[in-house]
Structures are given as structure tokens and as C-alpha cells.
A protein has these predicted regions:
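Bacterial N-terminal signal peptides that target proteins for export
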Residues: 2-13
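N-terminal signal peptide c-region/cleavage motif recognized by signal peptidases
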Residues: 20-22
Length: 206
């Protein structure tokens, strides 16, 4: 084969495997699918109800190995100016300076610092959230739902569900304390596409 002696065949094959090993091992790079990723939040409204609002990820990246979470890391920007409360007037009110202050801080930013693995599908993501120009440490319990090739074979996707409880006062939002709750419950449904297929122009439909 290729005119090489048998011993050199083995040496050549071993060298090829060693060259491929770094490509096959370790955490892979992902980008968040901003279409299929959503952030839902809820806050008490004067004791009457807990209305919901919707936010979207503007951009973000993830480094992740489903088998070894030690090198996992992520950063993402959340579009605050696009908040959706289901009503244009309510959207504008939430964006005012007393609450989200979208004019001065149109994005929130999260950067992870470490991942605490609990089992094969559950963990806690620790990091720093910058909201309204104020940075605070937060922890998000999360579930790894699935990491696999999609049914259409177009992408390798990692999907997560996470939750958080935020005290808005820690981020300088203290207005309307008599009618709006202090604690905000947050749910995140995230899908991230592995970068090795990001060059594809094909898009999956829901």
C-alpha cells in the first residue's frame, strides 16, 4: 500500500490518528439560534397576577462538550429594547428609565464564570449579569435537554432549559415598589448550533 513497508504503514496510520485527535476531543464552539431561543420572565403586579414578558437573545456563543463540562463557557447579549409584554403601550412603559432603561442600556449581557455539574443532564451555571449598567453575580440551575444532530441532518444542536430568580433592586430598579414585585422569575429555553455547520444556508422549520 502506497509502496510503504508494513511497519511504516502502522507508523503513518498512528500519526494520522494523533493529528485528528485534537479535532475530535474537547469542547466545541456553538452559536445561539436566536430564532429558537427565548427568555420568559414574570413579576408580581400588585398582588393581582404575575404577567409574563418575552425577551430574545441578540447574539451569543457557547463552548460545550456534552461528555465533559469542565471547559464549558458562554456569553450572550439579551435584547431589552425588543421586550414584548403583549401590548405596545406596556412595552414602552417597561422600557422607560425607571424599569429596564432601554434607551441607555438596550442590551443585558451575561458571561459565565463556571459550571457546576450535578449529573449527566443537570447543573448550575454561575456567571455575571450586567443589567442597566450594573453587574451582579447570578446562578442559573439548568437542564441539558439534548445534544445531537437534528432530524433533518442539517446541524448539531445543544438544547438547554434554565431558570433564575432576580432581585431587580440589585440592578438599580427600585421604582413602583408598592405595585410591582421586587423578584423577577426568569425561564430560558436555549438552542445552540455547532459552528462546524454554521456555513450552511439551509434553515430548518419548526
Amino acid at each position: 500500500m502506497f509502496g510503504l513497508p508494513p511497519t511504516r504503514h502502522l507508523a503513518w496510520f498512528a500519526a494520522a490518528l494523533l493529528a485528528l485527535a485534537p479535532l475530535q476531543a474537547g469542547a466545541a464552539s456553538y452559536r445561539y439560534d436566536v430564532v429558537h431561543s427565548q427568555i420568559l420572565f414574570s413579576i408580581d403586579h400588585d398582588g393581582y397576577s404575575h404577567p409574563f414578558g418575552l425577551l430574545h437573545i441578540a447574539r451569543g456563543w457557547l463552548r460545550f462538550d456534552p461528555h465533559d463540562w469542565s471547559g464549558a463557557a458562554t456569553e450572550l447579549d439579551i435584547d431589552l429594547a425588543g421586550v414584548d409584554m403583549g401590548d405596545a403601550g406596556w412595552n414602552a412603559a417597561v422600557c422607560k428609565r425607571a424599569l429596564l432603561d432601554c434607551a441607555n442600556h438596550p442590551y443585558a449581557h451575561f458571561a459565565s464564570t463556571r459550571v457546576e455539574r450535578q449529573d449527566d443532564h443537570h447543573g448550575v451555571l454561575h456567571g455575571e449579569l450586567t443589567l442597566r449598567g450594573i453587574t451582579q453575580e447570578v446562578s442559573l440551575p439548568f437542564t441539558l435537554n439534548r445534544a445531537a444532530m437534528t432530524i433533518y441532518g442539517l446541524h448539531t444542536v445543544a438544547g438547554f432549559s434554565a431558570t433564575a430568580m432576580l432581585d431587580r433592586r440589585r440592578f438599580g430598579s427600585t421604582a413602583f415598589s408598592g405595585s410591582i414585585g421586587q423578584h423577577v422569575t426568569v425561564w430560558l429555553e436555549l438552542e445552540a448550533i455547532r459552528d462546524e455547520t454554521s456555513h450552511s444556508t439551509s434553515r430548518e422549520q419548526p
